[in-house]
From Swiss-Prot:
Protein's recorded name: Coiled-coil-helix-coiled-coil-helix domain-containing protein C550.01c
Locations listed in the record: Cytoplasm; Nucleus
InterPro entries xref list: CHCH, Coa4-like
Organism of this sequence: Schizosaccharomyces pombe (strain 972 / ATCC 24843) (Fission yeast)
GO cellular component: mitochondrial intermembrane space; nucleus
Cystines in this chain: 27-57, 37-47
High-level lineage: Eukaryota, Fungi, Dikarya, Ascomycota, Taphrinomycotina
One Pfam family, short name: CHCH
PROSITE patterns in the cross-refs: CHCH (PS51808)
Top-level taxon of the source organism: Eukaryota
Keyword Transferase attributed: no
Keyword Transmembrane assigned: no
Residue span, CHCH domain: 24-65
Transmembrane stretches, start-end: none
């Protein structure tokens, strides 16, 4: 369920699940830098530095992210 918060001008705005998870889990700044890079370049391949910063931050707080091969193997079993 999305939460509602007030914007600086006093309007109500719904927060989505992803934003709430990032705030609770940390790494908001790293995620914003990654998003900014993508919107500036429209190419994830040009954002490897920002992606690595986000990955390191997330893994420091939550442990390793599953790899694509982990997901494929899990789906096969």
């Amino acid at each position: 369920m999305d939460s509602i918060e007030k914007t600086p001008d006093g309007e109500e705005e719904e927060k989505d699940v992803w934003d709430t998870a990032l705030e609770k889990g940390g790494c908001v700044e790293e995620h914003l830098r990654l998003n900014d890079c993508y919107w500036d370049t429209h190419d994830w391949r040009k954002c490897t530095e920002q992606m690595e910063e986000f990955r390191k931050c997330w893994e420091k707080r939550h442990g390793p992210l599953p790899s694509i091969s982990d997901k494929k193997n899990k789906n096969l079993s």
